[in-house]
Amino acid sequence: MASRMSMYSMASEALGGGPQAAQVSTTTLLNAIHNIYLSSQPYQLDASTSLVVNTWLTAAQAGATVDATLAARAWEHARRRAEDGCVILGSLHQSTPSLLVPFLNTFPFAIPASIYKSLEALQPFLRCVTPYNASAPRQIALGVTLTLSLGGNVTGASLALSQGGIDTENGLLNIPAEAGYRAFDVFYYLLTSASTPAEREFLGLKSPSAYALLARSGTYEPPSYLITADDGAAADDFRQALKEIGIKGSAHRNFISTLAGLLKLGNTLDYDADSDDFEEICEDVSGLLGMEPEVLMQQLSTEDRRTLVGGLYEALVDWVISKANSAIAAQMLRIRDGDESIDGRGVRTPTSNEDGDTVSITVVEVPEPSIGRALAMRTIFDDTIGINAEMIEDGVEVHPVGSSVVREMQQAVSDVAPDLGIMTGPQGRDRQHDLEKREVILEKVAYGSEDDSFVKKLLFPVEGEGVSLGRAGRFDLPALLSASRTWFHLSLHPTDDSPANLATLPAITSAWSAGTVSRQLRSWRLPEWANRRNRNLDYTADFDVDEFVGRYGALGCKDGKDGIETWMLERGWSNGEVFIGKERIWVREGPWWEAETMLDIKPAHSLQSMGQNPFTSGFDTSYSANPPNGSGFFPPPAMDNSLNGSNDQLMHTRNFSQGNMSQVTLNQHQNLNPQSAPSIAPSAMRNVQTTGDYGLGTKGDTYKGQVYYNEDGEFTGILDGELAKNKKIESKPLPFGRRAWIAFVWALTFWIPSPLLKFIGRMRRPDVRMAWREKFVLFFLIILINGMVVFWIIGFGKLLCPNANKAWNVKEVATHAEDEKSFWVAIHGKVYDITDFWQQQHSDTSIKVTKQNMLPLSGMVMDNYFMPPLNRACRGLGIKETTQLTFNDTITNPLAQHTSGFYTRDRTSALHDPDWYWKKFQPKIKEYYHGNLVWKKSKVKNEGENEQHMWATYGNEVYDLTDYLHTLDVNDNFDSYKFLNEDMVDLWKNSPGTNIKKDLDLLIANAKNETVSANLKNSWQCIQNIAYKGILDFRDSARCQVNNYLLLAFAIIICIVTAVKFLAALQFGSKRRPSPQDKFVICQVPVYTEGEDSLRKALDSLTALQYDNKRKLICVICDGVVVGQGNDRPTPKIVLDILGVDPKVDPPALPFKSVGSSSEQLNYGKVYSGLYEFEGNVVPYIVVVKVGKESEQSKAKPGNRGKRDSQILLMSFLNRVHHRAPMSPLELEMFHQVNNIIGVDPELYEYLLMVDADTCVEEDSLNRLVAACAHNAKIAGICGETALENDEKTWWTMIQVYEYFISHHLAKAFESLFGSVTCLPGCFTMYRLRSVDKGKPLIISDAVIKDYSVCDVDTLHKKNLLSLGEDRYLTTLMTKYFPEMSYKFIPDAQCKTAAPESWSVLLSQRRRWINSTIHNLVELMQLKELCGFCCFSMRFVVFIDLCGTIILPSTCVYIGYLIYILATGSGPIPYISLAMIGAVYGLQALIFILKRQWQHIGWMIIYILAFPIYSFILPLYSFWNQDNFSWGNTRIVIGEKGNKQVVAVDDEGFDPRSIPLQRWDDYALANNLPGRRGGYQEKTDYSYGDNYELDEIKSVYSAGPQGSVLTGMPGRNTYMPPQSPAFNNGRASTMGFQDSPMQHRQSMMSMGTGVHDMRSQSPYQDYPGQHPSVSNLRGQANLSPATGGGHSRSGTALGFSSGARSPMPDAMRSQSSFDFQHGHAGPNDMAIVESIRSVLCEVDLDTVTKKQVRALVEQRLQTELVGERRTFMDRQIDHELENM
């Protein structure tokens, strides 16, 4: 808890108030400076300026002199006034040491260690050695921004250079050619011995004298008068600092390569450089920088290279600063999470108050005296700008500045104008020209660099934005001063002597030169400064009148200026100390601190008893502490123990948190405010969770090692064995489908006895045993189907066509030609694989077996190479041993011809044996038999008939007599060669190519005598021995082809579906950016056991959505008070802490109906609401925490009913809102919070965005989803792409990346073509609440809610539908009841979610997904209306998906089989299967190649490697674990027989009367609340378009005055009608909160938006004198918290909001009513038309563009038109132009 006493109040004294009596002269000031120099003390020139004197000697030995009081004063103003501060560390002499680090050390809070490390790493880039300063900074300005919580602690920090950059001219490119000067220290550190030998060799480093940039002065060593002067030691420290800010590894290599490249490139800057050396240097430098040498040599001149060196060096420094800021942010995150202390050592306890409203203090070091002088003199003496101008305008009497001072000030500013961002004069134009030239050169170099080079990343830090050097990551120094409370800390130097001389002096304060010091005082006009400030302008705080009274009313200050003046006199303050201006109160430091001290010592209870708290009025939304209710819309309750009151009310809340004491709570203490409303629900549970933070119990508040779960994360409870004993027995009818299924299950599992399951399987309950039987049957059927599929694909074809894998035709044998590893040959109709034989030396002659001899034979038909002797092959035909056939084909390899018998060449060879062929060859070759050589029947017939190929078939065998007949032709039919029976030969001659079996058999059977018969038989035997060629190809038969054609048909179908999915995924063109939408959206986030990091990311992403903040509502529903694994407290407490709700808030627990069995339908919940701020976006939120009944509080998960119940809670609420039906007490409280507190009627919300708590939504996603729905009124549900946030975390996440991508871009894109996405994921889906045309409820319809809220989930099918796949089932129900609507997927809307990182979690997730998918697809198959017809319908696609999910294991088995076939070569290559697989993955690869998602190439490879996991392990595990549920004990199904289901009920049941229902109108009337709505029948004129009839709703968007937290919200695209009323029309809120000090000027820093003056910044208010500007039109919502300030002075280019104040008193301002019909949608059509006509009359139509016209029209209307308004404006512009 923050201390109420201030650090400042105890550590310092405030200055005396009032003008000082004596004038300050140069002499008196000089004397004072000498005194403080001797005593090492600071001197206060005025309340915001301190002077100190320092030398390097005093800084090194005694420590630098700095003013800690000034630091404390700046800190107090920042946190108390909620205003940004800026401390300028100015130097009046070139020899003063840097005070940046010493000054940071004086702040009264701890500075993170990473800031000092970052500065240590950065300083060598900015510091140089000069003769007058051993460490002279060369930057224009360096700022350290400290972001503080309003408790005063650091919550963030960053470093930045000013836009003026670095003086590289004097620090690098052109250092003075005098002894004592060096370039930036970093180059000497690079060249020291600290660099490793490997680095020196790689970089080619030499001594400093070898580099032209360093050699100009001849000075290479640091000054010797410094006792710590050692570049080597400094380099070691520097390298360590770099490592600690994250510059290590490849980043460090790139960094030193760039530095070395710059050094070497400096040697090319001389115009007379040697050409050979020049080319060598350019080659070397280009290698270091990653670019082509031609860029340096040919495309850049010498002057261009000079510019490149300076620009690239600045870009490198910017990169180092960005790395430093990342390291600081990482440490701040660890500090916030409690993982580290602020000094970087150890851990600490995280505090819950550091994530809220913030302010910033920026400490800016301006080392150059001329620049500091110009800044200071302009701030003090220029009365036309800044705070001086505001004071004068408000009536502060200021004496004019002397003309000489003005001229001197103007000359000082003119001398350094470009460094101050003033580009109007000659110097400015020259600077602008140089910057533009630098940008062109750097852009040329960047484009000439390699795509992944470090230089390109330096020059293009943000992809697609080009060179941003000097802008990105820099701050605008004048703009910073104009938007902050400025403090000056000026450092003088006592002498002009060189630093070396100081070391010889007797004392460290001996050096003194009055002339030197006097020159510094007079140069900066410090005497005039002191006199002017102390006489007129020394006011350090200013207030609005109401703001002043609100803050100090507790001290007796009365209303109005008269009351302030009276109180001022009572305090004894003169008009000079507190000045009452026209509109503001100006206070000097002394009186301000006196008043603040009185507030500090004032008891908190006395402040409360006065009816107000100064910490809740005027400043309560900025830095002060809110009362326990935290809202400011309810009266502060008395400090009563029953309300967990505390006397210390300074717990800082965050983000406008509506800690929201609800109406119920207030009603319990109506004596606090008689106008507060009574309870919503008379049945509010009084005794539930009344202790602990947020009223949610003590769990998580004190950690005592409570154990709620076992190791498996399951609740440790005991089941009652006597299931039906003492229980109520119910029975209900069973539908026919269920009865049939039960009968089928028992028919298949009757053989499994129930006692076995009960005692061995430990399934004591009948419903659990029945679920197991159902699971067993389903698993059996799935395995059976998978087995049938595998058998059909692999085995059925072989069964129909045996030996199909043993048949090869000539072409297939020829594929093994020249193949060493698969040596196939065909010999006499047989195919042999002689791979293991051919390399053996199998010849017994001189012929050697070599590759040259053997490989040409591979793949050949070798019949003629192995011809047996005819006299042996054709016995009985009288053939001589000298007779042989003459082959029709030429023998190409004679060495391979195996001629045996008579014609053997080598008589010693085994071939000389006439029986070699049968005795040797055939037995050996049979060992390598592989199959039959086959011939297509058509080929045999065609060649026989058309080509006279003398072959024919005998049955299935092919015989060829070509060689025999050719031998006869060659030998003129010589008798000795005519050995075959001529009648038999005539069969071949007369019928070639035909089947001669019948004729041949008949010829042999009808032989005339035995001699002829013997001759015929011998001839036939001879033909079989010498003419056999193989068999006919049986694989072409119908029996063998039917299975292939069936498989091919299904393959074609699958390919067509895949191809259509592919075409559906092809969406070319750029990513269109839709115009901003203006529909109201609820962002629902169901929360269960998520951790703080994921919850914060999810909420931050929703808050940062690029969507009108007022039109989105974050609705967080916490499913029970549950402590998640890894958390130290319940999830609801984590959520409320993130949102910034005060832990003291304890709203009542209100009853509502939950989705549960029996008595679990009664549940209680608590409601919290407020505003959450992130990165300048302030969004309303509502949190519903389900806390459970009183009887549940002792259980581990009180209130937990599941995600489906969380969805139903909100859907049911919106359903009742739509129908204006009676609501439960919880729903009434939700309505009250949304309608009256947040200020938006719930019926205005048109869309429901469902986001999981571990999902981060991209910024433009919501606008894209809404735009898609706005353009297509038929869309009822829409989802975007879900990508992985942790894709590279573990192996298990890696295998999911590709699957996520393809599942969206193939499956969902295909289904979206039909408008029938079957699964809208619950992690990122948006539903339309009601139809556009008739306002018909959709997602909130009665039918959907009824089916989705089934309470009795007691069967396996229901469990898988409603407990595992609720999101998919919700989509199924929407498709069922609204088939005419569309359900779309748009890839442009994206989100990121965290995938399971471990095997166990992945297994659990996929079990749920796969089983729910199957059961949901079964439901989808039963729907009657699915688009399409027959096989072209979505029903067919759903069937394909269902089959695909079921047969996943068989798919894996088949792919394994294919791999086996290919690896072993044991069968023909399945080309079709391989082509299909290639097509599927090829098309998928083509998708991400066309979408330029190159990274998915790698992810696809990983996915394919993990395919067995996805297709085999996960499905089988899922199928077997379909019954793996937690079964409730309340309702137990003890039997399903006949047509009845018997249920045992073990509790008191649910009585609907326990939840009282009440219509909102009745409740509002009874409690005097605004917002009467009327009944549903009164909605006849209701329109969901732009014409709302909602005056009676009294929302902030309706005509009536209704207060809400949105009144002060900054919004985008908000129409601000001129002269609209102040908040609440100047009247008190109807909620009974009478004090409204925030009506006019209110500090809004907690929004982080720069909204400071509600008269100019309220979304609905504007006043005369407020002129629109581009920055106004752009809005303030995207400014970071650091850019806003409580008192921003004037608009700047950075977009700081204007602080101009209207001179009109409040009474003169118009008090008109805000018209909702036009206010929420901007101006009407007529106003737009008039504005267009006016603009077109004023502009030059020949040069103006339509975009410019649109901008001018919007500027004239003071709003940005969106949606339909923008479309109307575009049409009207075209129309007006046509008519001109």
Curated annotation (Swiss-Prot):
It comes from the Eukaryota. Glycans are attached at N133, N153, N629, N644, N655, N660, N888, N1009, N1411, N1524. The keyword Glycosyltransferase applies. The gene is chsVb. Induction: Expression is induced in the absence of chsv. The ChsVb myosin motor-like domain (MMD) is shorter than the MMD of class V chitin synthases and does not contain typical ATP-binding motifs. Keywords: Cell membrane, Glycoprotein, Glycosyltransferase, Membrane, Motor protein, Myosin, Transferase, Transmembrane, Transmembrane helix. Polymerizes chitin, a structural polymer of the cell wall and septum, by transferring the sugar moiety of UDP-GlcNAc to the non-reducing end of the growing chitin polymer. ChsV and chsVb do perform additive, but not redundant, functions in septum formation. Functions not only in the maintenance of cell wall integrity under different osmotic conditions but also in polarized cell wall synthesis. Plays an important role in the complex infection process of this fungus. Its EC number is 2.4.1.16. This is Chitin synthase Vb.
